[in-house]
Design a protein with these regions (language model features):
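Cysteine-based protein phosphatase catalytic domain of the PTP/DSP
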Residues: 18-107, 123-162, 166
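Short cysteine clusters
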Residues: 110
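Conserved SAM/SAH-binding loop-helix junction
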Residues: 116
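Conserved G/P- and acidic residue-centered "switch" motifs that form tight phosphate/ATP-binding loops
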Residues: 113
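Hydrophobic positions on the alpha1 helix immediately C-terminal to the Walker A/P-loop
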Residues: 119-120
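N-terminal membrane-anchoring alpha-helices
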Residues: 1-25
């Protein structure tokens, strides 16, 4: 069945993989340290991960995680399409789980490290109490990784989860 899934997804995955390789050729930093022990970035090979990372969070739906990462790191995934979020319940559960992690550094990524991973990082920062508002989180993140952004559905899920933080 896995082979059949790959064959069916081929028309989507090949162009996406090529676009991803083009993006890599633009020489932007793969990741940025946002707060101590918490990195945000794009999809990387195991050799590109920052030192100190033990937990890798993958929020891509279009790529399978690299085997070297899946086999050598704690690896959690929440498959999410670009410019979207997962279900509110699964998103909240994962952000709470990440916020409680204290064993090692955490690397959160999507394909380019701009939207889906940023949405999850905002939630983690809110869960940890490191920021009080979505805008404060975005300012903190943009201070390190300027290319981040939230699409409307991503911001909406954050607002619905953290409405008690909104002024």
């Amino acid at each position: 069945m896995r082979l059949l899934n790959r064959v069916c997804m081929l028309p989507f995955c090949v162009p996406y993989e090529l676009a991803w390789k083009f993006y890599l050729s633009r020489q932007q930093p793969a990741w940025h340290l946002i707060v101590p022990g918490l990195w945000l970035g794009r999809r990387v090979q195991a050799s590109e991960l920052p030192k100190g990372v033990g937990l890798v969070i993958d929020v891509t739906a279009e790529f399978e995680g690299f085997r070297a990462i899946r086999d050598n790191y704690t690896y959690w995934t929440l498959p999410t399409l670009d410019a979207r979020t997962a279900t509110k319940q699964s998103f909240k559960a994962l952000s709470e789980r990440i916020a409680k992690w204290s064993e090692s550094g955490i690397y959160i990524h999507c394909a380019k490290g701009r939207g889906r991973s940023t949405t999850l990082l905002v939630a983690v920062l809110m869960e940890r109490g490191q920021v009080q508002t979505i805008d404060e989180a975005m300012e903190l993140i943009r201070g390190q990784r300027p290319q981040v952004r939230l699409h409307k559905p991503q911001r909406e899920v954050l607002e619905s989860l953290y409405e008690h933080h909104l002024a």
